[in-house]
Amino acid sequence: MNEVYEQTCFQIISFAGTAKSCFLEAIECAKAKGDPSELLKEGNDAIQQASISHQKALTLDANGELEVVLLLIHAETILSSAETVRDLSQTIID
């Protein structure tokens, strides 16, 4: 596994995990009658960074520089989960 690929996957995992945590905290904040806007912004910023890293992985794949291995699948699963929680958090908070 090449180093750029590994680093890219770990960036996706890290940013997506941060985003998911922020969105879940925003839900709890709203339930407690607080203002979740800063947590939502932080989550959206993190998910944007995860998406940029994911695009980098897709570019590596398109250039034939990437072998699909479990690490990328794991990273994509975490990113997908974070996107789902983001969407649900808006519904729950609104």
State each model region's role.
Residues 1-94:
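Terminal alpha-helical segments
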